[in-house]
Amino acid sequence: MKYDLIIIGSGSVGAAAGYYATRAGLKVLMTDAHMPPHQQGSHHGDTRLIRHAYGEGEKYVPLVLRAQALWDELSTHNEEPIFVRSGVVNLGPADSAFLANVARSAQQWQLNVERLDATALMTRWPEIRVPDNYIGLFEADSGFLRSELAITTWLRLAREAGCAQLFNSPVSHIHHDDNGVTIETSEGCYHASKALISAGTWVKALVPELPVQPVRKVFAWFKADGRYSTKNRFPAFTGEMPNGDQYYGFPAENDELKIGKHNGGQLIQAQEERKPFAAVASDGAEAFPFLRNVLPGIGGCLHGAACTYDNSPDEDFIIDTLPGHENTLVITGLSGHGFKFAPVLGEIAADFALGKTPSFDLTPFRLSRFSQ
């Protein structure tokens, strides 16, 4: 059987692409080296932030607004919502470049973002402590996503729509010819007119020339009481320290508050190098500078996990066809801020398989930018 689209890597982007392409009437084969959702990539750990006024640049705003609409639609397929509208407050020095981008995005796209000085911040959320020169940009319409529930939902919906799924079967080789794309797996060879490579952190095992650097990252859950929960209207957050370190976190659930450090981490080259949480001496204490200064009421570390970022050189996404192979789309280099975009990236992949022109300007995400 020849498929219209083979998906190599069915984590966040691949799971979304499988659903949207199958729903559009295509014959799709989803593959993954493991059984998604799993612990080997970048999507585990229960939750991920979604922000609309985007500190990483205005070019992402049209994508994330479309993603939000798709998240809202996906949530209708579950009793438990995938998107939780907790609001997100971005904390940092008043002269922060990240916050300037947030404000600029909000103004350009007329997003609902409220600026709070340090006094107003600490009045609204007494649990938060910040220096006098800090501000907060609060986006009430943002929040967080239940990442593993999202992937489970996409996989179920795709399967119910007739999508073929081949999991626990790594792809060892990809071959291109005039008839399309052939992949080799432990279960045999499969053929399609087009392919999506969304293999995340380990994409270089299949396409070594891609400029992607795997980085080991950790996040952890700390003891927190009901003051830090959504029931008390405590928001999700990002926080920039005076030295430039960037943190992110979520409202407490079941008396546990999850937090991670966005920058830093350990460069790795192979999956076996991603040691579990606490294997690196600094893991348990990584969030202490933020907690001690900004959330001093949070208790000790309860448990944690390790994941992997697939960083591009400029930490912007890579969304492009492989050079010389216009029938193969690669989406990678999401650099630790990609999950929120998964549905729109999956939709872009489905449109690629359908031969449709993208609805967005993807020029900033082309591979050619690295050779200029």
Curated annotation (Swiss-Prot):
Keywords: FAD, Flavoprotein, Oxidoreductase. The modification S-8alpha-FAD cysteine is found at C307. Gene3D superfamilies: D-Amino Acid Oxidase, subunit A, domain 2, FAD/NAD(P)-binding domain. Its EC number is 1.5.3.-. Its cofactor is FAD. Monomer. This is N-methyl-L-tryptophan oxidase.
